[in-house]
Amino acid sequence: MTVSAAVQQQAGEAGLLPSHQARLDYRTGKGWSTAGVANGFVQGNLAIIPEQYAGAFHRFCQLNPKPCPIIGMSDPGNPFIPALGADLDIRTDVPRYRVWRDGEMVEEPTDLLAHWLDDLVTFVLGCSFSFEEALMADGLPIRHIEQGCRVPMYRTNIACTPSGPFAGPMVVSMRPFKPAQAIRAVQITTRFPAVHGAPVHLGHPDQIGIVDINKPDYGDPVPVAADEIPVFWACGVTPQAVISAAKLPFAITHAPGLMLITDLKNKDLAVL
């Protein structure tokens, strides 16, 4: 039984939404990659920063909506965002987090109970895992889900528009498709601007500064067949690169590929 199927079964037995059941599983240390888990529900990237930087980061997201589409934001010090889910606790409901100090990643805890501060503001940003359901429903293969690994992600030479201390390169996620499939993937994902929308680049990874597609900066490599082209989407891991470059004294993000699963429905984010 797959992780997603197990979550669906547990949720049905407990009378919970699959998204809620997944969060409970992660809260108690069960599970790993969230790809393909609780299908139909929106997943989000996390950027958690001190309140004094929140205004500049909010503007950074507004200036860079492709990699940083905001789907939720907390009040300072509040680990709950009720609009995103019942019993959703930012401190415990993600499989793994990253703690940053002065731009360096210093720890990868499975909860934030020992790290939480009263001035922290949480930004939840749209994730491409949300549109993968629509791709699969149309019969398109998702390689990293087929292989049970994390989606490959790469730093690029595409510069984000800066705001205050926040500046740096866009990070992209990659999924390989045959050319006809790639065209269909563009058509489908254009409907989901709240979770990165259409791709930012197709083929020729060197044109966006990717030297070796077999060596992603985040996530896991997946094979690209001779009759396939790599398709790249703006990625919500971009804030990790930006926060690192800003050298904030303290910040928290999710570990790449290990997302927050919300109670929002993917279908409700579609614009067409």
UniProtKB/Swiss-Prot annotation:
Record field: transmembrane: none
InterPro entries: D-Glu_cyclase, Putative_hydro-lyase, UPF0317
EC number(s) on file: 4.2.1.-
Keywords for this protein: Lyase
Keyword Lyase found: yes
GO molecular function: lyase activity
Any Pfam family the entry gives: D-Glu_cyclase
Top-level class of the enzyme under EC nomenclature: lyase
UniProt cross-references to HAMAP family, sorted A to Z: Hydro_lyase
Entry similarity comment: Belongs to the D-glutamate cyclase family.
Entry protein name: Putative hydro-lyase BBta_2883
Keyword Lyase in record: yes
Natural source organism: Bradyrhizobium sp. (strain BTAi1 / ATCC BAA-1182)
